[in-house]
Amino acid sequence: MAMESALTSTRVSIPSLCSGISSSHHHHRSLSFLNFPKLSSFKYSFRTISPVPFVVSASSVSPSSPSTSVAQSQDLKIKSVPTKPIEGQKTGTSGLRKKVKVFMQDNYLANWIQALFNSLPLEDYKNGLLVLGGDGRYFNREAAQIIIKIAAGNGVGKILVGKDGILSTQAVSAVIRKREANGGFIMSASHNPGGPEYDWGIKFNYSSGQPAPESITDKIYGNTLSISEIKIADIPDVDLSQLGVTKYGNFSVEVVDPVADYLELMENVFDFSLIRSLVSRPDFRFVFDAMHAVTGAYAKPIFVDKLGASLESIANGVPLEDFGHGHPDPNLTYAEDLVNILYGENGPDFGAASDGDGDRNMILGRSFFVTPSDSVAIIAAQCQYAIHYFQSGPKGLARSMPTSGSLDRVAQKLNLPFFEVPTGWKFFGNLMDAGKLSICGEESFGTGSDHIREKDGIWAVLAWLSILAYRNKDKKSGEKLVSVADVVKDHWATYGRNFFSRYDYEECESEGANNMIEYLRDLISKSKAGDKYGSYSLDFADDFAYTDPVDGSVASKQGVRFVFSDGSRIIFRLSGTGSAGATVRIYIEQFEPDVSKHDMDAQIALKPLIDLALSVSKLKDFTGREKPTVIT
């Protein structure tokens, strides 16, 4: 298939209007296929950060505050460090994300960690077990020591931390659930760039493995405004490069293999022998791009050692503090090198990538891109046959509101409960905990199931490999294999195609972006069914609100929607997952049941709606932007 007809996304350069991120940081690096050390010797190098914002060791507590001993338990001396509130620590369910230099300010991270403990009931951590890990980005090493010492100072019994501080977001969730931990810290800014000039983040997950709810994140923020002391254990830095247990009085730190628990879970979810039957075939080739991010630590043990892929199939497989000067966001812009390989002459049969902390994924076939909206729908439609974990069928399906309606049609055909929720994985987690939901996804390259309480990039890759393996299990050597494109087109023929695109305008000036959303809210307040927008007739327009069927909580102002009589949709949202500015996202969708039109390029099929979206929103007037940063 020609690239023009198969590729439902367009790659565009970051405009010079984007501020705060230098163009040199976002150059498209060549894929590097590297030899891997054994996991037991796996380690990556750190640069030294100076100055350290909150030096805590046996000989010093803080460069900025005097301290006093307030408690001593056996060999564990607890110190109280006076502090003052620091502005700008508003916390969401994705935690707190800022530039590294912000977190390096005196007591900035320490204040937030202490505010978290001040927000939790004592029984949620006292003498309990907490998990700690991250994506390997710059500042994680120093942050891990701060977190360990403050946890000890607040009475935590044990910290379980991944070797070298490495644990993917989904592995943290899996470890929390398997070890019945009280919760866990994740050191990551997800898909945002890493390095001294870029982003860092921290979030807390609860005992279900789910991100802390707003009731807790709001308390954390409130406590950052009134904090006056930090409780910290006077212990030396813990060596995170060696597996094993270190004890300080009644507090201990266990350094664990970051892969073991997660790999065990994946082997319980999927039929690895089925996947191996495909991956080890000489006529099947695939590439997994770890983008020099956390899944590099998982790729070889899973894809090579367990499933029989060649070592050369893993690209950018060594986690680096700055992600190899790349932007670890698996889309058609930032994973362009992988895209070029799949669209190149004699490209591999299957390609995939994951992001900084491993929770996002991108799926590609030879000269074919699978939209995240289609991906989750296809996994849901095929899971009962191809994935061992779902052999009794899924309990229910759900998607975020901006995600296309592909999944809705699967739920309808399979007669399954279906939920449309705001953007944010926590909304899925509530439904999972209530036993109402098995498979869910977001158009922002997030896919997952109730095996954990986070989206899971490697899970999605294994799900697709399972589907391909199942569809090809009876194919003899030399027979043409069922391809990714075949699977997707078969799905479209059965369910229809939802043409879908997302325009991202990154790091816009916040005032203009907010003014645009307010303008749209005013516009929809005056709208009514039957209003004409060019050739489109309005069904309804609203600002999406959601009442959680589990706990009754209400989330309002979740995105401005224009839904037309033919089912087409235009949605406008501001995203808050960056560390600076605002990202304006526009979502455009149109359903097409006619198989003869399914091979159209999405940008061509959607052009009338795209033009309407830009016109209605007056985006250029409000933001000054001529072109989007990324088109998906």
UniProtKB/Swiss-Prot annotation:
Alpha-D-glucose 1,6-bisphosphate binds at R97, S190, D359, R360, T423, E442, S444, K455. One of its GO terms (molecular function) is phosphoglucomutase activity. One of its GO terms (biological process) is glucose metabolic process. Mg(2+) binds at S190, D355, D357, D359. It holds the Pfam family PGM_PMM_I. Its main location: plastid. The modification Phosphoserine is found at S190. PROSITE patterns: PGM_PMM. Residues 1-72 form a transit peptide. Inhibited by the Calvin cycle intermediates fructose-1,6-bisphosphate and ribulose-1,5-bisphosphate. It is found in: Plastid, Chloroplast. The keyword Plastid applies. Its EC number is 5.4.2.2. InterPro entries: A-D-PHexomutase_a/b/a-I, A-D-PHexomutase_a/b/a-I/II/III, A-D-PHexomutase_a/b/a-II, A-D-PHexomutase_a/b/a-III, A-D-PHexomutase_C_sf, A-D-PHexomutase_CS, Alpha-D-phosphohexomutase_SF, PGM. One of its GO terms (cellular component) is cytosol. Its cofactor is Mg(2+). Monomer. Catalyzes the reversible isomerization of alpha-D-glucose 1-phosphate to alpha-D-glucose 6-phosphate. The mechanism proceeds via the intermediate compound alpha-D-glucose 1,6-bisphosphate. This enzyme participates in both the breakdown and synthesis of glucose. Promotes gravitropic responses, negative in shoots but positive in roots, by facilitating starch granules (statoliths) formation. Belongs to the phosphohexose mutase family. This is Phosphoglucomutase, chloroplastic.
